[in-house]
Amino acid sequence: MKILIILSIILCSLFGRADLEYVDNDIYTYNGGRNENGCLEVYDPYEKFNRKVFAFNSVLDYIIFRPLAVGYKNITNDYIKARVNSFISNVYTPLTVVNYGLQLNYDKTMKSVWRFLINTTLGIGGLFDVASKVGLQSDRQTFGSTLAHYGVAPGPYLVLPIIGSTNARDMTDSVITNYAINPLMYYTHNDFDLWILAVSKITDRYIVLPFSDYVMKNSTDPYVAIRSALHRAREASVQYPENFKCPKPKN
């Protein structure tokens, strides 16, 4: 059973969550404000290698993981999906607390602490997002977000076998860092951690189903479309230091 869970986790990473929003006329936009001082241009010096890995990952996704996401979509109603999303978000709130702390952002650190406590208790283990109703919203932070806070640019775009799309700055997030520095993971059973990770990846893949399906069917170059969407969505989600300028790629 553990092997199946771990396999699901790995396969779920083939398409990263891009926080994309479907709008009319088959056009996709990016959630979140535009980060004017971010690195809006993708740096892809390893494109030849990345394309080969992208093709490999796409086959695995089509055969194995996309069907899992479609199954999740079909067997759960909107109410269940909302409870799952709220629960998963709450589980990762301690990670946000740690990263806001590393960013020396006291206000958002304390808001995230209170958000976790309220949703864990009054929200029945995080199944309901009670904290947002009292003004305690919190943007999910990763170690990559913290590095960006201190002026670390995304670096080269990478597509890794099985793991999927990332960049030099964020590549440890989905593999090691997010779980190594999440305090909750040290106080829960390993089986629980694996299930949480698997479910979160399944929901992430479900969220991008409309976008990935549209791109794979209609785009003349799915690699470029997905690369651009993931990169811009990620850049819109991080906050660089004031007056930060993205370094120009070396030729």
Swiss-Prot record:
InterPro entries associated with the record: MlaA (IPR007428)
Signal peptide from the UniProt entry: 1-18
Keywords for this protein: Signal
Keyword Membrane among UniProt keywords: no
GO cellular component, one term: membrane
One BP term from GO: intermembrane phospholipid transfer
Family indicated by similarity: Belongs to the MlaA family.
Protein name from the UniProt record: Uncharacterized protein RP093
